[in-house]
Amino acid sequence: MTAVHSLPADVQAQVSAAEWQTRVDLAACYRLVALHGWDDLIFTHISAKVPGTEDFLINPFGLMFHEITASSLVKVDASGKKLMDSPYEINPAGYTIHSAVHEVRHDVECVLHTHTAAGIAVSCQKQGLLPLSQQSLFVLSSLSYHAYEGVALNHEEKARLQADLGASNFLILPNHGLLTCGGSIADTFLMMFTLQRACEVQVMAQSGGAELIHIPGQILAGARDMIAGVMRSKTGMGGQLAWPALLRKLDQQNPGYRQ
């Protein structure tokens, strides 16, 4: 087995400044997912487009999320071919899912997929995510579902995933997990934080056995424009506000992602 320290140390010298910054932010995102307890050993994946190209970065299959660094991320082209030397391969199911999104969603920089207990629990419910919390209000304005087809190794599934995702930023994969995609790594992380919290609240509320209060439909409909502003950095809000604070927390608890 290849040790983490055997990864090439000169990656920064081989890539553009823009790609290196994307690598740093994506490595931070992996470690933040681990810090929040959303990781699933070496499984699941987060990807980010290499600026100005159709290539994307994804995790080396075999590293835990809390270990990932800017240099260890694997760069692949649209066909999944590695573009730089790495002792690691990528998760083939990860390629299927992430390439499907990046192929058609040119507004998306980052795709984040998780297998959390609360996320899977909600994904198993026929009614899906319910309008129970303020967090669910944010999600329901841009939510789609993609039915489970088994482990995502069949590339023919890509077209169906693309059709189901459409223009949404949130995707629930029944019997499987959660996915968010956004115009920046920061926004995509914030979206997953919101979706994950909405699922946690739903599972906890249901466990109490009491009759639940649903957010009225007119509030859901009227909140769409406001939600778009809060969730996206291009409006001056969204992830760009929270990201520096998240990095400060990460620097205190698990630094090293910039290597």
Curated annotation (Swiss-Prot):
> Under the GO molecular function aspect, what terms does this record hold?
actin filament binding; metal ion binding
Q: How is the cofactor bound?
A: Binds 1 zinc ion per subunit.
Q: Which GO terms describe its cellular component?
A: cytoskeleton
Q: Where does Zn(2+) bind?
A: 113, 115, 176
Gene Ontology biological process: monosaccharide metabolic process
Annotated disulfide bonds: none
Sorted keywords for this record are: Metal-binding, Zinc
| Keyword hit for Nucleotide-binding | no
Cofactor(s) listed in the protein's UniProt record:
Zn(2+)
Residue runs in coiled coils: none
The record, for Pfam families, names: Aldolase_II (PF00596)
Q: Which family does it belong to?
A: Belongs to the aldolase class II family.
Q: What is this protein called?
A: Putative aldolase class 2 protein PA3430
What is the taxonomic lineage of the source species?
Bacteria, Pseudomonadati, Pseudomonadota, Gammaproteobacteria, Pseudomonadales
